[in-house]
Curated annotation (Swiss-Prot):
It comes from the Eukaryota. This is Pregnancy-associated glycoprotein 62A. It comes from Dama dama. Belongs to the peptidase A1 family. The keyword Hydrolase applies.
Length: 12
């Protein structure tokens, strides 16, 4: 699952 946000990138 990958989620990209304007302030932070989170990869789990």
């Amino acid at each position: 699952y990958q989620k990209s946000s304007p302030g932070s990138n989170i990869t789990t």
